[in-house]
Amino acid sequence: MGIAFGREICGDYHTSSSREWLVTNGIGGYASGTIAGVLTRRYHGLLIAALQPPLGRTLMLTKLEEIVHYHQQIYALSTDRWSGGKIEPQGYRHIEQFKLDGTIPTWRYACGDALLQKRVWMQQGANTTYVHYDLLRASQPIGLFLKALVNYRDHHGAIKSWGWQMAVDRVETGVKVTAADEATPLYLLSDQAEALTLHDWYYNFDLAVERARGLSDREDHLHVATFHLTLLPGHSITLVASTESSPELNGNTAFKQRQNYEQKLLNFWKTDRAFSAKNDPDWLNQLVLAADQFIVSRTVTLPPPDQIPVYPHSAALLSGKTILAGYPWFSDWGRDTMISLPGLTLATGRSEIARLILRTFSHYVSQGMLPNRFPDAGEQPEYNTVDATLWYFEAIRQYYQVTQDDDLVMELFPTLADIIDWHCRGTRFNIHLDPADGLLYAGETGLQLTWMDAKVGDWVVTPRMGKPIEVNALWYNALRTMARFSRMLGKPHQEYEAIADRTLARFSRFWNSEVGYCYDVLDTPTGNDPTLRPNQIFAVSLTETPLTPAQQRGVVDACARSLLTSYGLRSLAPDQPSYQAHYGGDPRQRDGAYHQGTVWGWLIGAFVIAHLRVYADPIQARQFLEPMADHLNNHGLGSLSEIFEGDPPITPRGCIAQAWTVAEVLRAWNATER
């Protein structure tokens, strides 16, 4: 695994401030920042704690301002950008190297002839961040000063201090910071350094990326303590930031635990792929580690019968798992979870995690629907999705294909049967089976129900009301899956087969013979929609394809000609009047381009599998995935982005680490090796 940069990247402000790192803790918390150390997003910080795992994410420790005293010289290792654009200090100039050690960001700072190494990681399962310094080389001891800047806000927000007084108290090995009476305390601890407490607001940090996103770009942070010590050559110090009062303080012990955890993940992957692991490129190992960052715990409470489940606040009855859709801002979404599950868990040798996720979401099924998302603020789950539930069937099918777990299928079968029943007779949002043609209809005015779900105020950018092609391809596959499960369990299967046969017979309505590919949506309020979008690729990539071989080839070729890029498929063909080549600006501008030409990385997986089905050339199919190896070095380091601009140079945008992009690259790579 070779993500590493020297001075040509680290010493240039533009490049070192645009490449971002991420570490996570398995319960929704994370730390994130730039190589330079400058804050450019409201989501940057050393401890963003999940106070209601996996949500309730709260910025607690923003950063450490690091200063080295050595040979009568003062070296400021931090980098800050202030209102007005001034960059001071410029610590990025001292970075000799940055690399990822697994997922652990590692810096080496050159201060004269001294070399100081820094690592940042989190404890799995705890809101605890470790910042560890090693003095690798020096001709005499250094003085190291660490100024702790804190906050206490939702990670989506931004704070102006307005005279906010936090309680800063000394504890045995550091300080305890309490932002308000009901706030969760932050402990800043080191058993090696002395701590001097302060209460000094730093005003007007400039968040350049937030400004580009049309959002508030100013923030204040509170300096609560300075830790200082004399560090000898060959010695180390660890600063621990935690919501726990007594975390492990030995940095070497904690670091070894983290390394062992990541090695275990790679062992799962390699054991599962013993037949081919020796031929895998190193960058796939980095993706396996990235895959784990999205898998988090979710505590489930079982609601009373016939009640819509609410976000769990009461006593836990089940310890479950879920998938965060993307860092830094997404929560767990039903659609993203089910699409991501095969690649993040099954493709990495972690079927037991897949089982937990499938069981977790079964408790949230309501009126035959999976939740669309769980809001960060802890309200009821939202159910405005037509496809998440159908992706649930596909995730279970792939899980069973790998595990042959009859017990889980038997457990979930009543839920699956209920889902089919609700869809046949009709559920929320006018989602129902049209008895006239056996196709699934979805939508009402003002709603967005498919994955192309951008909405600004009352403006639904891509309403797709009617019979979307990918929804009906998924519906057809769900019916065939249910028929197989029914036969396996000795239950009646004829009804599922009959509905599936009817869907198959009328799926031909999607074929647009005039252009040689499929309509995107049938029976919209204005007729059939002939717009070339990538959604039809799923009618080829899913196991049960309702298209003829000639139609499959037509779809793949059309997508390859007009939608394919190095990092995914465009959401709209460039020759369409609504095509948007640029993704940027304020929320309205961004959402207006989100599915109107913007490239989506996750779609490369379905394209590769569809191409493999049509052309039966695994070497060529795999070549479509190889540009992602370069992308691991360019945005969210060690991970894959959510979206990219539609025109060259296909600039990455959106989340720096997106679950379904990582998942689909892993899944598709596995498919090319079968």
Spell out what each predicted region is:
Residues M1-R674:
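Acidic, mature catalytic/reactive cores of soluble proteins
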